[in-house]
Design a protein with these regions (language model features):
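An aromatic- and histidine-rich active-site surface loop
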Residues: 71-72, 85-109, 115-123
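N-terminal subdomain of nucleotide-sugar transferases
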Residues: 1-44, 49-54, 107-109
């Protein structure tokens, strides 16, 4: 299967989401799947592949409430135009999920959304 994993940060960035997605991506590759990770462009990442996982960087930041900056349209085009079988987005309230919200109906692949907390919901901006 062709699988796209979307997360705000990925290796060499360090954190819980990054580790979960890295483990998932690499284990899917070992099982014979073609895995791409869509993530934030980092100046410390000097590779486009890691342990069989293709990394596609996007210069995007923010979310729907605070506003998104960067190449949001490029990210949407990438996700909606590639023949992925499954797309998994880890975490909400960040650009890899929020940028796809208006384009969900254009994504033909199966979609899996895994929220790992809604830590910003107490903020007044999320009340509307």
């Amino acid at each position: 299967m062709r699988i796209l994993l979307c997360c705000e940060f990925y290796s060499p960035s360090v954190g819980g989401v990054q580790e979960v997605m890295k483990q998932l991506a690499e284990r899917l590759v070992v099982r014979g799947h073609e895995v791409t990770v869509a993530t934030t462009e980092l100046p410390t990442r000097f590779f486009g592949q890691l342990n069989g996982v293709t990394i596609r960087e996007f210069k995007v930041s923010g979310n729907l409430v605070r506003g998104m900056e960067g190449k949001v349209a490029e990210y949407r085009r990438f996700v909606t135009s590639q023949p992925f079988d499954v797309i998994m987005v880890k975490a909400a309230q960040q650009w890899t999920f929020d940028a796809l919200w208006p384009a969900l109906s254009k994504i033909k692949a199966g979609k899996v959304f895994v929220p790992c907390g809604f830590s910003g919901l107490y903020e007044p901006a999320y009340a509307e």
